[in-house]
């Protein structure tokens, strides 16, 4: 006799609070584990953290901060093509071994022009060139600090005499010595005709020493990814992002197991064969296989687990996150394609569980939405500091001019009142800097790997779980006590 359970229930769905990792024999110390992993087929990370392509999470400041820690940020697409490409460019110029395409300013421009460029590109100095791109001077923020005449030509304030320059063959160690000996902070790199071909800065050399684990490309620039949707201008957006320096493109939709997503993936790989294309979101091995067969370089996993997502209650669809992660992990064995576990993470222990279930990295939104570097608005409520945080399926995010309604396949809906949101908007407590948050997350991850005897993330995939009851969840949290001192890595579940 058939039954609903026998005919319709095809799997058990488990998520983070349903299980705990079983401690195992270990000869691994937390401080000795390696956190290196893959974001996509060709991009390595030094820590397994990716910041989400959300308009209250990742713009240039967040992407720079997470890349300096060793992860990567995905610039959201709720902006014009030009604005998103600019955010990518800002990240790529934030740090360099040598800046190969430095921002320059033409002789004859004004102080106002120079100040605007410094502000737009977050830089402190600009080489001045003539119409043939030959170096004629350099202007820095120190030259302009007390300059009140904004219409004054930069020729009158720039440094032009006894310019210290170097040539393309100079390595960074030699460049550092030149900077030190001449007590300067910027070293233009010129060719035999005195045309500028690069710029080496003291700040970049110092940053490289201070952040040795930063995630960088072969030119010494911070890595960054950028999100796109499935729209008529997707390829135009991709082209602008790739030209701006994006290391990877993330095709970001609510349902990656879709004909339209697959078609856009094929178009993207054909147009940009040398760029890694990440695709999501999915929740089954079948979906992941389909995407990889059509060229995906990484698969993003998660249908509705996020704190600001309502897909599971609005649409009745989803797979509890740990089961979804393992389903995709099992399907992708032997392909060399990593998976990104996206959503549902509240504590560092959840990160350990997500990676142990098969994730190569985790995508974080709420965990960093309250940081200084997030683009969310800072607000004061009842004397406490908060930052706004909203889902890309929220009404507020979808109804913007360049909003995210296409992510939920509602791109042709013109009236806001006709939109069907799959997310909410809210606020999260202010948390300080990304560096502080990531430090605690890494500490918890290292500890978990030590308990499991895993010296790297691939080894962590061999860890075993135990299913727990609601009583086990209660026992896992602090109990029978009034907390009088808050820990930086724990708050009671609401």
Q: PLM features: residue spans?
A:
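Catalytic beta/alpha-barrel core
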Residues: 74-78, 104-105, 125-127, 165-167, ...
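Glycine-rich phosphate-binding active-site loops on the catalytic face of alpha/beta enzymes
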Residues: 68-83, 246-258, 297-315, 345-379
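Bateman/CBS regulatory modules and CBS-like beta-alpha motifs in cytosolic regions of diverse proteins
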Residues: 33-46, 52-54, 83-121, 128-130, ...
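Alpha/beta catalytic cores of nucleotide-metabolism and tRNA/nucleoside-modifying enzymes
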Residues: 1-25, 105-106, 167, 227, ...
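Active-site-adjacent beta->alpha loops and helix N-cap segments on the catalytic face
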Residues: 31, 80-89, 147-151, 195-215, ...
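Short beta->alpha transition motifs characteristic of CBS
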Residues: 75-80, 123, 127, 135-150, ...
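Catalytic cores of alpha/beta
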Residues: 61-64, 236-244, 277, 283-301, ...
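Short beta-strand/loop segments at the ligand-binding rim of alpha/beta enzyme cores
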Residues: 44-51, 97-102, 161, 217-227, ...
């Amino acid at each position: 006799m058939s039954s609903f359970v026998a005919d319709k229930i095809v799997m058990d769905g488990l998520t983070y609070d349903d299980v705990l990792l079983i401690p195992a024999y270990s000869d691994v110390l937390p401080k000795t584990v390696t956190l290196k992993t893959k974001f996509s087929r060709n991009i390595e990370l030094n820590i397994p953290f990716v910041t989400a392509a959300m308009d209250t999470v990742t713009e240039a400041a967040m992407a720079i901060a997470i890349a300096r820690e060793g992860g990567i940020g995905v610039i959201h697409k709720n902006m014009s093509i030009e604005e998103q490409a600019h955010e990518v460019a800002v990240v790529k110029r934030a740090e360099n071994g040598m800046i190969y395409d430095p921002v320059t300013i033409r002789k004859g421009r004004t102080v106002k022009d120079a100040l605007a460029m410094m502000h737009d590109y977050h830089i402190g100095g600009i080489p001045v060139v003539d119409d043939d791109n030959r170096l004629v001077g350099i202007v820095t923020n120190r030259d302009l600090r007390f300059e009140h005449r904004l219409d004054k030509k930069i020729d009158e304030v720039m440094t032009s005499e006894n310019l210290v320059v170097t040539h393309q063959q100079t390595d960074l160690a030699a460049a550092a010595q030149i900077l030190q000996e001449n007590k300067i902070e910027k070293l233009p790199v010129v060719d035999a005709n005195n045309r500028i071909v690069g710029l080496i800065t003291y700040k970049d050399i110092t940053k490289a020493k201070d952040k040795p684990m930063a995630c960088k490309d072969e030119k010494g620039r911070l890595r960054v990814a950028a999100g796109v949707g499935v729209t008529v201008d997707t390829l135009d957006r991709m082209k602008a992002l790739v030209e701006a320096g994006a290391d990877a493109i993330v095709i970001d939709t609510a349902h990656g197991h879709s004909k339209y997503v697959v078609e856009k993936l094929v178009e993207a790989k054909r147009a940009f064969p040398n760029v890694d294309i990440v695709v999501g979101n999915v929740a089954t091995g079948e979906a992941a296989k389909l995407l990889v067969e059509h060229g995906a370089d990484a698969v993003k996993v998660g249908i509705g687990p996020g704190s600001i997502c309502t897909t599971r209650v609005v649409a009745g669809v989803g797979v509890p996150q740990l089961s979804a992660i393992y389903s995709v992990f099992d399907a992708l064995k032997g392909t060399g394609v990593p998976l990104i576990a996206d959503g549902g993470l509240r504590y560092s222990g959840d990160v350990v569980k997500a990676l142990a279930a098969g994730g190569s990295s985790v995508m974080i939104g709420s965990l960093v939405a309250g940081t200084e570097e997030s683009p969310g608005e800072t607000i004061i409520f009842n004397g406490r500091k908060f930052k706004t945080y909203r889902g890309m399926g929220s009404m507020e995010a979808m109804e913007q001019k360049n909003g995210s309604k296409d992510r939920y396949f509602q791109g042709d809906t013109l009236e806001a009142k006709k939109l069907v949101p799959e997310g909410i908007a809210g606020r999260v407590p202010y948390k300080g800097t990304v560096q502080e948050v990531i430090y605690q997350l890494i500490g918890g991850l290292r500890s978990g790997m030590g308990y499991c005897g895993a010296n790297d993330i691939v080894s962590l995939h061999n860890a075993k779980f135990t299913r727990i009851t609601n009583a086990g969840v209660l026992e896992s949290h602090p109990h029978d006590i009034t907390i009088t001192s808050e820990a930086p890595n724990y708050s009671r579940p609401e």
